[in-house]
């Protein structure tokens, strides 16, 4: 059986091969690009305004950590499963006048405006003025979540709070 190009006039032989290569490249591009895009939650792009790596303050000394949109998506998912019951829409149900805004996080005693401070708070929740244990927020002991698991929601909450300065 003759090849398809042998039936076509000479001027059509190159374009048919070109279209075949364009089709193959398009399929490869779609196959490689879509899994990456699927891992980033649209919420992270739209509301946290993250499309690439972002630096967030780690501690009071000014050290920072860099997070990818994928890491923030994972943090958002963990926040939804562990924190959303009390922090719907950035509010704090036990104390509605205190939100997750950076202004409110900075005003806490001790301040909770760095990743390290938020992670410490998750291990030992204190009242806003730091005087007593917070009965509205349950502590997250290492037996429930290891340090890595506890650390994931903090960057998402921190980035969320940055939108409400």
Curated annotation (Swiss-Prot):
How many cofactor units bind, and how? Answer: Binds 1 heme c group covalently per subunit.
Looking at the keywords, is Membrane present?
A: yes
User: What topology does the record note for this protein and the membrane?
Assistant: Peripheral membrane protein
Instruction: Tell me where the signal peptide lies.
Output: 1-38
Query: Subcellular localization, per the record?
Result: Cellular thylakoid membrane
Keyword terms of this UniProt record = Electron transport, Heme, Iron, Membrane, Metal-binding, Photosynthesis, Photosystem II, Signal, Thylakoid, Transport
Any one GO MF term held by the record is: metal ion binding
Q: What InterPro entries would the database entry show?
A: Cyt_c-like_dom, Cyt_c-like_dom_sf, Cytochrom_C550
- Disulfide links within the chain: none
Supply one GO BP term. Answer: photosynthesis
Name the residues that bind heme c: 83, 86-87, 137
Described by its record, this protein's role is as follows: Possible low-potential cytochrome c.
Into which family does the record put it? Belongs to the cytochrome c family. PsbV subfamily.
* Protein name per Swiss-Prot or TrEMBL: Cytochrome c-550-like protein
Underlying gene: psbV2
């Amino acid at each position: 059986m003759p090849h398809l190009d042998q039936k076509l006039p000479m001027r059509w032989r190159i374009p048919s091969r070109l279209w075949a290569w364009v089709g193959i490249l398009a399929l490869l591009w779609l196959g490689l690009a879509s899994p990456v895009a699927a891992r980033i939650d649209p919420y992270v792009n739209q509301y946290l305004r993250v499309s690439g790596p972002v630096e967030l303050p780690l501690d009071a000394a000014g050290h920072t950590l860099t997070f990818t949109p994928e890491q923030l998506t994972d943090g958002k998912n963990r926040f939804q499963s562990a924190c959303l019951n009390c922090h719907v829409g950035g509010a704090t149900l036990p104390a509605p006048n205190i939100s997750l805004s950076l202004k409110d996080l900075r005003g806490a005693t001790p301040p909770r405006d760095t990743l390290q401070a938020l992670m410490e708070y998750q291990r030992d929740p204190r009242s806003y003025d730091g005087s007593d244990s917070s009965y509205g927020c349950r502590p997250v002991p290492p037996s429930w979540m290891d340090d890595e698991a506890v650390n994931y929601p903090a960057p998402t909450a921190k980035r969320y709070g940055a939108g409400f300065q």
